[in-house]
């Protein structure tokens, strides 16, 4: 007797073995109750870039709100939906405005997010529309007040990030304005899933998603201590790959690495 999928529960391929576990559903098929805080160490670096070059990587109906590239490097540990395991991620976004059918939405558009484990990549791509792909991401290591990490693909180092507590940002007030934009409504994503067959050139799904900043949390969500925040100097080093270096991602790193930066801040 064949199975019947339960439309009230979440599934991901392969669906043959029952509902899946995601950040939004536990093994009993209910919402996860995060009774233990996820430990998050987050480093962010912001730098100016050429407005025309940034606009060239935006989808239709998006416009550039400010000529900045924002790179987040997060280390997540004690993640409840991963049974206490953790992973690293690095996301690249730009401040934008999306002109939708019902109005204009302002927020950062996530261009790409690298993660070092398949589980968060799959759930984020399929359920939330994140443009997630895989890379090896070193843990942040710190010595003498300088924190560093690097990203590699097939052994090719394509991105280095450095955060220096020994020096201040070049323009602290502007940095705060970019990172704490009061007009931002959240993080936007451009979801695209190709249709099977027909040359694989058409979309099964293609639309803009929003993670709203003002989303109301359930009443049973615990409150945890406020984040500890430090501003410091930083530096970005992109290494431009060939196709042989990063066979399926070379065009991503080439495009981002070609965005010239005149000013670097974190």
Regions found by a protein language model. Name each.
Residues 23-73:
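N-terminal ordered "arm"
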Residues 41, 88-90, 143-147:
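Residues at beta-strand starts and edge strands
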Residues 48, 74, 95-97, 114, ...:
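Structured loops at beta-to-helix junctions and adjacent beta-edge loops in soluble globular domains
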Residues 28-33, 55-61, 81, 96, ...:
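Intrinsically disordered, low-complexity boundary segments flanking structured domains
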Residues 81, 101-105, 174:
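Low-complexity, polar-biased intrinsically disordered regions enriched in Pro/Ser/Thr/Gly
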Residues 93-128:
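Hydrophobic alpha-helical segments and helix pairs
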Residues 65-99:
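Short, structured protein-protein interaction patches enriched in aromatics and acidic/basic residues
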Residues 2-26, 124-265:
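Interaction-surface and assembly-scaffold signal
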